[in-house]
Regions:
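A contiguous active-site-proximal alpha/beta segment in oxidoreductase catalytic domains
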Residues: 149-209, 219
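Positively charged n-region of N-terminal signal peptides that target proteins for export
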Residues: 1-5
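Rossmann-like dinucleotide-binding domain that binds NAD(P)(H)
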Residues: 198-266, 324-327, 331
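NAD(P)-dinucleotide binding in Rossmann-like oxidoreductases
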Residues: 239-241, 251-314, 318-324, 328, ...
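Short helix/strand-capping hinge loops at secondary-structure junctions
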Residues: 140-142, 147-148
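C-terminal helix-rich "cap/oligomerization" subdomain common to oxidoreductases
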Residues: 111, 116-121, 313-356
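Bacterial N-terminal signal peptides
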Residues: 7-19
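N-terminal glycine-/serine-/threonine-rich beta1-alpha1-beta2 phosphate-ribose binding loop
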Residues: 22-139, 165, 250, 313
């Protein structure tokens, strides 16, 4: 009898170890490069959640390289703050079964790349992104880069070009692009086919030149989402002490605008014009408006929609935003700067993707 019990117990233990080994072998190991951008914390909360289900199942942030930037005074402060949060995340649950293995902190990019299958770049200083991305892409690791993709159109093109050459999937995006209240305006039943869109959001006139793509990307990605994607052929830009106003004309004649708010209350939303009606868009983190009423008492989803897209990407290798669209947004911002320098002249858009 005792021998039978021992044999049964042994089989159970072996089965458990076998299951754990299979799970470990199947685990998609994610690494973070640079943690001084809050995205490092926001998305890890979803990717490392105990007993994750659905798209988040079978993956985890396992290692991070907390490199910072000497040119950003806040880099060290934020890096230390987010490192503390990441180190403690899911480490002291009420139920021990809910504990998650701690994130390993490494001291080199080479060491990070040895430990992971995929990488997320969250360095606050976008000037670092190109060099960081080159190492990741040459190592063949699927790569997501927190906005902005790069600090210049030239660096953005170089990153996407290398991704294509190495056949390594890579993309970047703002969480606003996937927020339900914005993405849900495409084919909204009260709007119909989108004819035009006016988006608005923050614009900091004191932003250093290297950060000029940081804030506008939230609203410009919202604009591209609602308008249905790329196709801009020309841009004009008017600039005053209170407003940065960019008007983009699509090749089919539709017009979209971006109002960058420099002074006064800052909100992020849009007005959408369609063949059935005109409606305000929702607000970040909430659902689509109904009869012009924007929901605010529904579930706040925040970063979850983009976290979902990142998880899908790491599982499938399919990017939700094509390189050509990302580079067109950089071309639009470049053309807007040129238009502003020429007193608001119409500037044709360059196709950065085809000329890469």
């Amino acid at each position: 009898m005792n021998r039978q019990l021992i044999t049964l117990a042994t089989l159970i233990v072996l089965e458990l170890f076998s299951t754990v080994s299979v799970q470990a072998a199947d685990l998609i190991r994610i690494g973070i490069l640079g943690i001084d951008n809050y995205g490092s914390v926001a998305y890890t909360e979803f990717l490392n959640k105990p007993h994750a289900e659905g798209v988040f199942e079978g993956m985890r942030v396992v290692a991070a390289y907390p490199i910072g930037s000497d040119d950003y005074p806040e880099s060290k402060t934020l890096g230390d703050k987010w490192k503390d949060q990441l180190s403690k995340m899911y480490q002291t649950p009420k139920d021990p079964k809910d504990a998650v293995p701690p994130i390993d902190w490494v001291d080199s990019l080479d060491e990070l790349l040895k430990r992971v299958d995929c990488v997320m770049i969250f360095s606050l200083d976008a000037r670092l992104h190109r060099k960081q991305a080159e190492s990741v892409l040459r190592a063949g690791k699927k790569l997501f880069i927190g906005r902005p993709l790069a600090s210049s159109p030239e660096d953005a093109v170089a990153i996407m070009k290398l991704a294509a050459e190495t056949k390594t999937p890579c993309w970047s995006g703002s969480q606003h692009r996937f927020s339900t209240g914005f993405a849900g305006m495409v084919n909204h039943p009260e709007v119909g086919k989108v004819i035009g869109c006016d988006v608005y959001g923050g614009w900091d006139p004191k932003t250093p030149e290297v950060d000029k793509f940081w804030l506008p990307l939230h609203s410009l990605e919202t604009l591209y989402t609602i308008m249905g994607g790329p196709g801009v052929v020309s841009v004009t830009c008017a600039s005053t002490p209170t407003t940065e106003s960019i008007t983009a004309t699509w090749k089919d004649g539709r017009v979209g605008t971006y109002r960058g708010i420099k002074e006064g209350a800052v909100k992020y939303s849009a007005t959408v014009f369609g063949d059935k009606g005109v409606s305000t868009a929702g607000i970040y983190g909430h659902g689509i408006p109904v009869m012009g009423v924007v929901p605010t008492n529904d579930e706040y989803v925040g970063y979850k929609p983009l976290a979902t897209e990142i998880a899908k990407f790491f599982k499938t290798g399919q990017v939700p935003v094509q390189p050509g669209e990302t580079l067109e947004i950089f071309a639009l911002m470049q053309a807007a700067e040129e238009s502003k320098a020429k007193g608001g002249a119409v500037v044709p858009l360059k196709n950065l993707w085809e000329t890469k």
